Swiss-Prot record:
It is found in: Cytoplasm. During stationary phase, converts 70S ribosomes to an inactive dimeric form (100S ribosomes). Keywords: Cytoplasm, Translation regulation. Its main location: cytoplasm. InterPro entries: Ribosome_modulation_factor (IPR007040), RMF_sf (IPR023200). Belongs to the ribosome modulation factor family. One of its GO terms (cellular component) is cytoplasm. The keyword Cytoplasm applies. It comes from Shewanella amazonensis (strain ATCC BAA-1098 / SB2B). GO terms for biological process: regulation of translation. This is Ribosome modulation factor.
């Protein structure tokens, strides 16, 4: 049975979240498409918030 790839926007959010938790700058967003970039930045913000509140460590 084939596994389906996640939706592109979900993947952009997840990558942004990983970047935020990892402490990367939001200027390092790899997306130029507005929708994907917005999702990446949303994930990045949540990742940074989680890192700041102590939910995640590097």
């Amino acid at each position: 049975m084939k596994r389906q790839k996640r939706d592109r926007l979900d993947r952009a959010f997840a990558k942004g979240f990983q970047a935020g938790v990892g402490g990367r700058s939001k200027e390092m967003c790899p997306y130029s498409n507005l929708d994907s970039r917005s999702q990446w930045l949303g994930g990045w913000r949540e990742g940074v918030d989680g890192r700041i509140t102590g939910l995640f460590t590097k």
